[in-house]
Regions:
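Rossmann-like dinucleotide-binding cores of NAD(P)H-dependent redox enzymes
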Residues: 18-19, 24-28, 34-107, 166-171
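Short, T/G/N/S-enriched strand-turn elements that build extracellular solenoid repeat scaffolds
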Residues: 1-3
Length: 171
């Protein structure tokens, strides 16, 4: 989200959320992939009012529709407000809350929460990973590997978030 800086309290990344000092009473989680869904589940379990927002047409967008539907139904039964096919716009952060518009089609709803968690746009950090003399092939910033997790350089293997989705280093 452009011009939105994570401060670790009102606006959080998933890493910052793991270190939060105070549990928010309410939170909007932007991105309903594995990271967003996990945070939605456990924050809700601890009593935070959770709104989970996904731009695509179902939560857990890299999973099959059937699995996502079962998880979404469970989330709704547990009290998580799931919004799919929804964009987050006009985010305004102040000392006590975050206000934003949730846009779905031609309908806009303004909501306010204590915090917003950004669970989108994980980027691999390969800078300084190896000597510049090692010609490691990257694909959109991620280390390219074969079926055995070997990189383009014989004997160098990679696994985890550095090879791309699904990004699960937060667990």
């Amino acid at each position: 989200l452009p011009d939105l800086e994570a401060d670790g309290e009102r606006v959080m990344t998933s890493r910052q959320a793991l270190e939060m000092k105070k549990q928010p009473k309410s939170i909007v989680i932007v991105g309903a992939g594995a990271i967003g869904a996990e945070f939605a589940y456990f924050l809700n379990a601890f009593g935070t009012k959770v709104t989970l927002v996904e731009m695509l047409d179902h939560i857990l967008p890299v999973e099959d529709h059937e699995t996502a539907a079962v998880v979404e139904k469970s989330f709704i039964q547990e009290g998580i407000d799931c919004r799919v096919s929804t964009a987050v716009e006009n985010i305004k952060v102040n000392a006590k809350s975050v206000k934003m518009d949730l846009v779905k089609g031609d309908k806009t709803e303004s909501i306010t929460a204590d915090s917003i968690l950004l669970a989108i746009g994980v980027v691999a950090n390969t800078e300084g990973l190896l000597s510049p003399r090692v010609n490691l092939k990257l694909d959109r910033g991620y280390v390219k590997v074969d079926d055995n997790y070997e990189s383009s350089v014989k004997g160098i293997f990679a696994a985890g978030d550095i090879i791309g989705p699904p990004w699960l280093a937060h667990v």
